[in-house]
């Protein structure tokens, strides 16, 4: 079986890394956008949600606005002139609390070793043919 090397290549020549299954200490790639997943099969299983890690404060501000419907925090929505697309993707406080509760055990537990066969072959899906 061929192992999937998480974070080995950015997506389509960008600085975006698919780190959805990554669970490794000190693995952040500087100057990148690393996308994590907390979907039910992932190491820190919260049922849904994720996060994007970055050390770029401008990207962090933009991503935060996009996660909150394109709105700026702490400004009443009626007073805003929305300048970017938004997705309503913020994590609920209840899910974040569950993550904090599950984190210590996830840190102790050995992560799953994903193999390439764990993903479907996109070339066989009608939409990609």
Question: Would you name each region that the model predicts?
Answer:
Residues 1-37:
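Conserved PLP phosphate-binding loop immediately N-terminal to the Schiff-base lysine helix
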């Amino acid at each position: 079986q061929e192992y999937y090397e998480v974070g080995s290549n950015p997506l389509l020549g960008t600085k975006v890394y698919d780190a959805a299954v990554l669970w490794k200490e000190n693995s952040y790639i500087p100057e990148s956008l690393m996308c994590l997943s907390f979907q039910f099969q992932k190491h820190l299983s919260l049922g849904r949600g994720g996060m994007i890690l970055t050390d770029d404060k401008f990207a962090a501000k933009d991503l935060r606005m996009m996660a909150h419907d394109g709105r700026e925090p702490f400004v009443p929505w009626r007073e805003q002139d929305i300048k970017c697309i938004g997705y309503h993707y913020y994590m609920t406080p209840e899910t974040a609390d569950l993550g904090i509760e599950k984190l210590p055990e996830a840190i102790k537990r050995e992560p799953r070793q994903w193999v390439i066969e764990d993903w479907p072959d996109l070339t066989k899906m009608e939409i990609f043919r």
